[in-house]
A protein has these predicted regions:
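Bacterial N-terminal signal peptides that target proteins for export
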Residues: 2-14
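N-terminal cleavable signal peptides for secretion/export
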Residues: 27-74, 78-92
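Mature, soluble, non-transmembrane domains
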Residues: 113-286
């Protein structure tokens, strides 16, 4: 698989890191329930660093992340990541990942569809849904081919995963591990995740000139540095030496907004700067 194909076909970890959450203004921070806030965010991508054997010399791109919904109707996410990858000597490939998901507010049901394009050619397409049961989670795939399978009942969907990360950060925990299912790749994989949460940052720590810094609603809101590593569950079970498929780093606000992204694909790292942020009104439950 080429670097460009691998970059395009990996479901960006942003699906698990940039959901926006908010909490009521009253009560102790650790006792507040996590309430999701609809938002639209744009991140500009660039090559952060390369490591030995890296096959690219430049990355330029953008992520569009549009999240909506509430705990009653469920949560929808429209996601698109377009990236130009320069492998040197004038060889530039364009990857385009498009994804739409819906997750039930009760964290039991999950629907997903995605398409990966490389140089405008469709590389693969995934479509399916999953539902938690008492003994297992049932997955029904329509694409890339019809398949019905059961996955670990302990696996959580992306939104619920981030709820637990925020709850852990509020409680002062530094390590969190959960299996996560997001329907990515061929739709039949569960990823083990390891989340490392740093100390809470103050208002003057790690200042950034980005859209978050210019958002009045974020003034005085606590945030934490977070790194989430993703491991293929089947490979992790076979080997004690686990190397993540990818890892993401970001600053996570108490209300769920993420900034200062770092997408680590092992041989190269892509950074994401939050350049546009629109926080939408929360739709009340009917």
């Amino acid at each position: 698989m080429s670097v460009a194909h691998g970059f395009a076909s990996s479901r960006s970890a942003l699906l698990a890191c940039t959901l926006l959450f908010a909490a009521p203004a009253s009560g102790n921070a650790q006792d507040r329930s996590v309430v999701l806030v609809p938002h639209r965010a744009v991140y500009d991508l660039a090559l952060g660093q390369t490591r030995e054997n890296a096959q690219i010399v430049g990355v330029r791109g953008r992520i569009l992340y549009d999240f909506d919904g509430n705990a009653c109707d469920g949560y929808t996410l429209q996601f698109r990541q377009v990236s130009e990858l320069d492998s040197g000597e004038g060889k530039i490939s364009t990857s385009d990942l498009r994804s739409t998901t819906w997750e039930g507010g009760d964290a039991k049901r999950f629907k997903f569809t995605s398409q990966n394009f490389l140089d405008r050619n469709l590389v693969d397409s995934v479509d399916g849904h999953a539902e938690h049961g008492s003994a297992a989670t049932a997955v029904d795939l329509a694409k890339p081919e019809h398949k019905v399978l059961d996955i670990d009942a302990a696996a959580v969907y992306p939104t619920q995963h981030m709820v637990r990360v925020i709850e852990a950060a509020r409680a002062g925990k530094t390590i969190l591990d959960f299996p996560v299912y997001d329907g990515s790749d061929t739709g039949d994989k569960v990823y083990d995740t390891l989340t490392v949460i740093g100390r809470k940052l103050g208002p003057d720590d790690r200042k950034h000139d980005d859209a978050a810094a210019k958002a009045p609603k974020l003034a005085g809101v606590s945030r934490w540095p977070v790194t989430i590593s993703y491991f293929e569950k089947s490979k992790a079970q076979k080997s004690t030496e686990q190397t993540p498929v990818y890892a993401i780093g970001f600053e996570l606000y108490d209300n769920g907004i993420s900034r200062a992204l770092s997408l680590d694909y092992n041989d190269f790292v892509v950074t994401g700067k939050l350049t546009s942020l629109e926080i939408k009104d929360i739709k009340p439950c009917r």
